[in-house]
């Protein structure tokens, strides 16, 4: 590509923001033209993030000063409630937008307002947003002006689950259970007691049992694939004592004698970022650390009709910034691996 794509990042001081900067620094087709932060305006990116010294000469600007309307695409790595106020103006000016918050993920406005506790500022734009689960919605993403980047838990659960629900029949009346674990970075960079080392280290706990915001997002994704499947879906997240990583264990009660391992292998045979492991393997979170990968395995429980699906991602990469870059590549007709060919870190 002769002319580079001009990229803006709104809210670039959080973990997903710095991941976007890290990944885009290695992208051959883009120029990061603007990074914004109201609290750090005037601070050099390299001073705020020493990991980026020698990579970026930019300084943070306020959104009003950054000239975002001159960009080809803008990423919103902001808390919930920001993109829905600021994205409509950019879209009207022809700028394409990828929102990494939850503002445009849930199509039913009352449901979104119930779970996120605020009035939606751009309800008319929600119906235009494309849900950016890249492997499952590629054609729509390619045409999108606005992409709602999925949450980390929905990505980890939906990538294995959707192909299986499309082709395998579950036993009626049996619950569909997703038991998930996340690293502490999933809570974001803003300080809170629960993410302190003395609280999260050497500890393991469930949370959000009465209801997690990613529950309606997953239910929306699987609704209609089988009768009553969304209503019977149970999701329990846990906080694990690690910085990065996400692990989902999904239990399927099958009734039709199909082979779910074959289904997954066939569906993701040519996938660039979804890896179906050999039979009997179990994926580890460290096997995807820093990479835009989802590794999946599936095994039948002993003396049971239950199949156990295991899925791992890096919550900050495939679960956030990496999938956002993948969606950008699809939107602009670029090679999907551009900026995303990093090998996982070990140890």
UniProtKB/Swiss-Prot annotation:
PROSITE patterns: ARGC
Record has Protease as a keyword: no
UniProt GO MF annotations: N-acetyl-gamma-glutamyl-phosphate reductase activity; NAD binding; NADP+ binding
A single GO cellular-component term on record: cytoplasm
Keywords assigned by UniProt, alphabetized: Amino-acid biosynthesis, Arginine biosynthesis, Cytoplasm, NADP, Oxidoreductase
Main subcellular localisation: cytoplasm
Keyword tRNA-binding tagged: no
Domain of life of the native organism: Bacteria
Catalytic activity as recorded in UniProt: N-acetyl-L-glutamate 5-semialdehyde + phosphate + NADP(+) = N-acetyl-L-glutamyl 5-phosphate + NADPH + H(+)
GO-annotated biological processes: L-arginine biosynthetic process
Annotated family: Belongs to the NAGSA dehydrogenase family. Type 1 subfamily.
Function comment: Catalyzes the NADPH-dependent reduction of N-acetyl-5-glutamyl phosphate to yield N-acetyl-L-glutamate 5-semialdehyde.
Protein name stated in the entry: N-acetyl-gamma-glutamyl-phosphate reductase
